[in-house]
């Protein structure tokens, strides 16, 4: 009797649960009898993956939080490894969450079980030599960005560009009017989306400055509506407090619950913290101004030790190899500077049209049916039965 393929997965974050579910669906098309177990959330369970632990049990951020939860995390890792090894998987797939997954992947690879890491760490931005450590842990890396496999190739590591799932989800042409109707916004008024990040530390650094810039912008654009989507319930009170101290007109300020994509769709221009949200804004074809601040000591350490290997911070600019979106970092991230950069987009629609054409090219480059390609790359590693 031929044994069904056995595939173990670890999704350490909500985004990984989403990726894992899409991957499982595509693997089932190729391997109808395959069995799936691991660490996941509701989406992976909906794809009929038996989860031994929930994704939320691994989702901790920040050094102090990790240290506080370290005994529990180590216990989960031990129990997962013991149980999965006894189950005899044909392949182990770690999805993102490299701090947890790479150690587990290496442990299984040392026991001659195939391992895959889905979503490369940002080795193109800093600590490129991590590629060698990653290669010691996995048989194959599945990359979301085209500039990543050539870096791994320098270290003799098998890496495949599969495309970005977000580029598959978002259509090439988007509907601003429907988004505005959903949010109760006027169809013809100027709209700015403000996204100062999803972490408390980011919002503390950027939120007030972003809202001050929006307040200054409203003086230049009468009738401006500002939408501020709170990424989660934890950060909403801080945003509400910052908004109450801002100069924004109350009637035209809209603090939303977890509606980032709808907010960006509804907007003419987006003011956004550097991170994944910049990629989403690009795929939605929205002009943006990108900003970021970290603690001064952290910034000095990064600059002094030359830890960053890139001259650009925003993902659209990195992908394009040119400055498509203004970047205002550290001391340059001031309300007047942000306001001026935002106003430039509002006042020059011809620049917006040219930008949208360039964003469409990048969207096309990233849209590769990521889950399908990832499933193909994993199927190749399975033993022939």
UniProtKB/Swiss-Prot annotation:
Its EC number is 2.4.1.182. Pathway: Bacterial outer membrane biogenesis; LPS lipid A biosynthesis. GO terms for molecular function: lipid-A-disaccharide synthase activity; phospholipid binding. Keywords: Glycosyltransferase, Lipid A biosynthesis, Lipid biosynthesis, Lipid metabolism, Transferase. It is an enzyme of class 2 (transferase). InterPro entries: Glyco_trans_19. GO terms for biological process: lipid A biosynthetic process. One of its GO terms (cellular component) is membrane. It comes from the Bacteria. It catalyses: a lipid X + a UDP-2-N,3-O-bis[(3R)-3-hydroxyacyl]-alpha-D-glucosamine = a lipid A disaccharide + UDP + H(+). It holds the Pfam family LpxB. Condensation of UDP-2,3-diacylglucosamine and 2,3-diacylglucosamine-1-phosphate to form lipid A disaccharide, a precursor of lipid A, a phosphorylated glycolipid that anchors the lipopolysaccharide to the outer membrane of the cell. Belongs to the LpxB family. This is Lipid-A-disaccharide synthase. It comes from Xylella fastidiosa (strain 9a5c).
């Amino acid at each position: 009797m031929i044994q069904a393929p056995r595939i173990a997965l670890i999704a350490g974050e909500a985004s990984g649960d989403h990726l894992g579910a899409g991957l499982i669906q595509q693997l089932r098309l190729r391997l109808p009898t395959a069995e799936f177990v691991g660490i996941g959330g509701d989406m992976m369970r909906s794809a009929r993956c038996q989860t031994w632990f929930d994704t939320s049990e691994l989702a901790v951020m920040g050094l102090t939080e990790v240290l506080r939860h370290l005994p529990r995390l180590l216990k989960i890792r031990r129990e997962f490894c013991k149980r999965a090894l006894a189950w005899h998987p044909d392949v182990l797939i770690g999805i993102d969450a490299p701090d947890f997954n790479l150690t587990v992947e290496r442990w299984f690879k040392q026991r001659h079980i195939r391992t895959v890491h889905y979503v490369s760490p940002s080795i193109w931005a800093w600590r490129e030599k991590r590629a060698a450590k990653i290669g010691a842990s996995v048989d194959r890396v599945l990359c979301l960005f085209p500039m990543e496999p050539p870096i791994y190739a320098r270290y003799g590591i098998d890496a495949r560009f599969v495309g970005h799932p977000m580029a598959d989800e978002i259509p090439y042409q988007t509907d601003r009017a429907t988004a505005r109707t959903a949010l109760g916004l006027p169809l013809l008024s100027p709209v700015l989306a403000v996204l100062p990040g999803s972490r408390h530390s980011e919002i503390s650094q950027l939120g007030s400055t972003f809202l001050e810039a929006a307040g200054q912008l409203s003086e230049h654009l009468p009738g401006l509506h500002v939408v501020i989507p709170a990424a989660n319930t934890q950060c909403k009170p801080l945003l509400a407090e910052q908004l109450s101290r801002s100069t924004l007109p109350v009637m035209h300020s809209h603090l939303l619950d977890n509606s980032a994509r709808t907010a960006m769709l509804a907007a003419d221009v987006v003011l956004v913290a550097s991170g994944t949200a910049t990629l989403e804004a690009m795929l939605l074809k929205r002009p943006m101004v990108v900003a970021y601040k970290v603690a001064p000591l952290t910034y000095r350490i990064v600059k002094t030790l030359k830890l960053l290997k890139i001259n650009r911070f925003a993902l659209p600019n990195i992908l394009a190899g040119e400055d498509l979106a203004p970047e205002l970092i550290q001391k340059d991230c001031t309300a007047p500077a942000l306001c001026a950069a935002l106003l430039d987009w509002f006042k020059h629609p011809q620049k917006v049209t040219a930008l949208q054409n360039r964003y469409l090219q990048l969207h096309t480059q990233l849209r590769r049916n990521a889950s399908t390609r990832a499933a193909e790359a994993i199927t190749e590693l399975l033993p022939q039965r």
